[in-house]
Amino acid sequence: MIKNLKINDGKATALISLSPSDMQPYDIPIFIDDESGDIQRESQIYPILDRVKSFFKRINIVGLIRDISIEINQACYEQSDYEPTELDNKELANDLKIVNITAYFDDLLFIYYSGSFLPDMEISAQITYEGELENLEIYDK
């Protein structure tokens, strides 16, 4: 699941292999941040890595992306009379790509990109290890 863990200049990076249903497995960069700014040994980040592994064993990544797409559509259409449909949510979910993940001890920060629907924007979703969305931001690249 987590591979190619490297520690350089006090920072830890790796790849996490995800395989959502109906899709080919793919690797996503993951940054591990213990908030010390000075990671020297793998053992410093074991607690975070354990939480990440547990999260991805429990969470349905397709369901998570679907939930994020609903939140994005609600945020995008909040100022209008248009109510996003299930098809809108499904199309956005199919287009969303996880660019990278940053893992902290308390939560995860997912960065998403939607080339068809929000090509000039970046989407960040702060997710707890229980799978709850804490914060969603959509901003210019």
Describe these PLM feature segments:
Residues 1-18, 94, 100-141:
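Acidic, proline/glycine-rich low-complexity IDRs
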